[in-house]
Amino acid sequence: MYNAVGIDVSKGKSTVAVLRPGGTVIRKTFDVSHTSQNLNELADYLSSLDGTTKIVMECTGRYHEPMVKALSEAGLFISIVNPHLIKNFGNNSLRKVKSDPADARKIARYTLDNWTELRQYSGMDNTRTQLKTLNSQFSFFMKQKVAAKANLIALLDNTYPGVNKLFDSPTREDGSEKWVDYAYSFWHADCVRKIGLKAFTERYMSFCKKHHYIFQQDRPEKLFNASKELVAVFPKEKTYKLLIQQSIQQLNLASEHVERFRREMNELASTLPEYSTVMGIYGVGKTYGPQLIAEIGDVSRFTHREALTAFAGVGPGVDESGQHKSKSNRASKVGSARHCFRS
């Protein structure tokens, strides 16, 4: 005996429909609030049903996660499916009905029709959910970092033009950059050229020692001579110093968050079985690899490469009818923009 449970998830509550083969209704469609008590009661009810029970719900952002957590911990079979599959399922009625109970029943019918192909939610899916959340936060702080850096450069162009191009040292593991550290100490061109070469050399040596940079004997003279040719629009005043140093602090904080998320994502992704395969792709590194895994999910559910292309939403559509046969079609736009591998 099969029990097909369709759950239409929304924010704070879900609508549940329970069907058996032949369209037999086990219980009238009902709503469940996303509270601990109500979710536990739902889990107890579904566990008490005679026969084999499978539960299907759509992947709707983060709204489905409380339901998934409660039912998976109860040992029930849960499958999370792409909403587009449900949308295109069973559209054989002239009457269009859009309501939570109707959607829940539609998901339950989908469960019955695809009973043997349903893929069960696993612990690995929880890891992938964590990875996707980290990737979202990584992207958020990366945007903040880019904005903070652009703002800082705009300010420095008025006090120490071109300071961001003085050094080509790579970004450190903590996200710090040499030119940013240098600009914090020497925020204005007058901080260099007005104190004389000898005094600047001593200050630059102290700067390198403090931040653990290699001191080069000829570097202070080059920096000193270059500063003489610069035109500073803003005067060397306390207000501009405060603005620049606060901007640097904001940039360093965003950079620290970015690097922390980058490390955490790589560590988490390395626990997944597909990690070595993805990292073996040419051009994929410790940043792009975990991002691919986060947005693609479990690659084992794709039986061929066209399935992955369709999931990403970048597959070319088919335009054929009668004698017409298009040879050049636009890529489809179905699915999340993140699945197009843009981060």
Report the location of each language-model feature.
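A detector of single, family-specific signature residues
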Residues: 1-343
